[in-house]
A protein has these predicted regions:
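Patatin-like phospholipase
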Residues: 1-38, 46-251
Length: 251
């Protein structure tokens, strides 16, 4: 039997595009055998397995202008542009509850991509319980420059998109025969280099992350070109915006 895998790129609030696609999947009872998400792709993607249609768009519309949820207020107060307590505790547990039991009952392997701060390498961590592994999901979406690294055990992690923005090759290596890849960038998008001055300043504290950031545009653009070959050859179906989504992104 063919094994179908789903890959979700990050992209901060461009992830609303992903949320809409996932809601359409739920409407049409489209199921996957394995799922991997990066950054916002991981944070929003778990709602697909919990079957909570509309939740991602609903809570982001409700809270994204709340100064306690995200923005300079939590950045100055705790060093994270997205509040750890408000966004990762209050919202999913009380204000707009996430159904962790339904998520676990889906029995679909879900992986969040994180970047190891010490090595600069990607790691793919299976999420068995969203509430028990919230720090892993938080790490996957912890953007450099505006987030503190997240400690998990004796290691520290940042945004998975630093090291592997579109992990389609990794998921194919998990015995998936056919992939659906949701991108948050349009067909013509190619990533540009980051400011080397800014990255080198960041590299004083996180040298391996800085190395990745300096090469990220090359790695991302190579991945996009390879994915287009997979798409043309029928190995992957790619769902992407038809035109640019104009939302600020730091990486």
């Amino acid at each position: 039997m063919m094994k179908k895998g789903l890959v979700m790129e990050g992209g901060a609030m461009r992830g609303m595009f992903t949320a809409g696609v996932l809601d359409t999947f739920l409407d049409n009872d489209i199921k996957m055998d394995s799922v991997v998400g990066v950054s916002a792709g991981a944070l929003f993607g778990v709602n697909y397995l919990s079957g909570q249609k509309g939740r991602v768009i609903r809570y982001n519309k409700r809270f994204n202008k709340d100064k306690n949820y995200m923005g300079f207020h939590p950045l100055l107060r705790e060093g994270n542009i997205v509040s750890t307590k408000y966004a990762y505790e209050d919202v999913p547990k009380t204000l707009d509850p996430f159904d962790d039991e339904a998520y676990k009952k889906s029995n679909v392997p879900f992986y969040a991509v994180v970047t190891n701060v010490a090595t600069g390498n990607p790691e793919y961590i299976q999420i068995h319980s969203v509430f028990e592994q919230m720090d892993t999901l938080r790490a996957s979406g912890s953007m450099p420059f505006v987030s503190k690294p997240v400690a998990i055990g004796d290691k520290k992690y940042l945004d998975g998109g630093i090291a592997d923005s579109i992990p389609f090759e990794w998921l194919a290596g998990q015995d998936c025969d056919k992939l659906i890849v949701i991108l948050t960038r349009d067909m013509e998008y190619r990533k540009k280099p980051m400011s080397p001055v800014l990255v080198k300043l960041y590299g004083r504290k996180y040298p391996k992350i800085a190395e990745r950031l300096l090469q990220r545009h090359n790695n991302y653009n190579r991945a996009v070109e390879e994915l287009r070959k997979w798409e043309a050859g029928g190995k992957a179906m790619v769902i992407r915006p038809s035109s640019p989504i104009e939302i600020l992104s730091l990486i």
